[in-house]
Every structure is written in structure tokens, then in C-alpha cells.
Regions:
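Long, charged low-complexity intrinsically disordered regions
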Residues: 2-189
Length: 189
């Protein structure tokens, strides 16, 4: 079977330590979250079922004519990601709901980044899906991890292990780093 994370220990500063198949590793919490969300969004884009959270104050955005048209064309996919959007005309949209794990202050940036991803031709469906999932994961992982409890750390690590890829974040950055006895010897001199 695949190696399991055990003995999680939150380190603060957005990191946690754990054993991975007997090796001592440090995990970047934000990148781990991005990997988990990325896999979740890829699945969602496949079957279109995301949870939307209603915003207390809808966010009004003014788009260019092209962006507005692109958004209208892809309205169904935006909805499947968990966006609740009203088209007010004149290039104005009102975002009334966002995906459940999206920080509210990331909404406008998210919409613009997603429009970039959606401008990938539909003929490149897989690439397009991956780009969209990567944008969503980046947005969702933005919230700075506060200090985690041991249980939260354990839950995050088991979700990470379930993705089958705990080496790299969607943007290709390392999620885990092994700390070897040599590293420790060097540090302690």
C-alpha cells in the first residue's frame, strides 16, 4: 500500500511535521491544502456538484464586453464550481455566492483568473479543466493557516495521502521535505 503519514505535529508558521513511512518530513500546510482542493475541483468539474456559500454583501464587478460574453458562455461551469452569479447587463455582474472554501476577499481576483483559464479552447478540455482547478485551488488555499490542532493536522495529512500525490502542489512546488539525520547533524554541528 501507499505510505501513511503518522505522528503529526503542528509546527506553526504554516508547517507541520510528521513521519512518512518512518521518515521525518515537514509539510507546507498551504501547498497541501492546494493539492487537496485541486483534486476536489477536478472531480467537481467532471460531475458538476459544488457547494455554494451565499455572500452577505453581493460583490459587483464590471467586466469588459469580451469577459462578460465569456462568462455568459461558461455560466453553467461557473455554477458547477459553486458561483452564484447574476448578469446585470452592461458588462456588470453581481456575485451572490461563491464556492464554499473560497475566502470572500478573493472573489474578484478569482473571477478574473478563472476567465483567463476559461479562455483556453474547449478542444483542450483536459488542460482547460486542470487550469480551472488550479485557479480554484490557489484561491481556496489562500487563507493563512492559523495554528492547527493535532486532529486538524492528522485530517489534513490523511486527505493529502488520499490524493496520491503528496510531493508537489498544483503549481509544481514541493509540499513535503524530508529531514534526514545528516540534516540534523549539520544543524547541530
Amino acid at each position: 500500500g501507499r505510505p501513511e503519514f503518522t505522528d503529526p505535529l503542528p509546527l506553526g508558521g504554516g508547517y507541520l511535521a510528521a513521519l512518512l513511512g518512518g521518515r521525518f518530513v515537514v509539510v507546507d500546510v498551504r501547498r497541501a491544502r492546494a493539492r487537496i482542493l485541486y483534486e476536489d475541483y477536478l472531480k467537481m468539474l467532471g460531475n458538476g456538484s459544488s457547494v455554494s456559500q451565499q455572500l452577505l454583501f453581493p460583490e459587483r464587478l464590471v467586466l469588459s464586453g469580451d469577459e462578460y460574453a465569456l462568462l455568459e458562455e461558461n455560466a453553467v461551469e461557473f455554477a458547477s464550481l459553486g458561483f452564484d452569479i447574476d448578469f446585470a447587463g452592461e458588462g456588470t455582474i453581481e456575485v451572490k455566492g461563491t464556492p464554499a472554501d473560497m475566502p470572500a476577499d478573493a472573489v474578484d481576483q478569482m473571477v478574473y483568473d478563472l476567465l483567463q483559464a476559461f479562455s483556453t479552447p474547449v478542444s483542450l478540455a483536459d488542460q482547460r479543466r486542470e487550469k480551472i482547478a488550479a485557479v480554484m485551488a490557489r484561491g481556496g488555499a489562500k487563507g493563512i493557516p492559523r495554528n492547527m490542532s493535532r486532529d486538524e493536522a492528522a485530517a489534513l495529512l490523511s486527505q493529502l495521502a488520499a490524493t496520491g500525490n503528496f510531493s508537489f502542489s498544483p503549481s509544481g512546488k514541493a509540499i513535503t521535505a524530508e529531514i534526514t539525520p545528516e540534516d540534523i547533524r549539520t544543524k547541530l554541528g
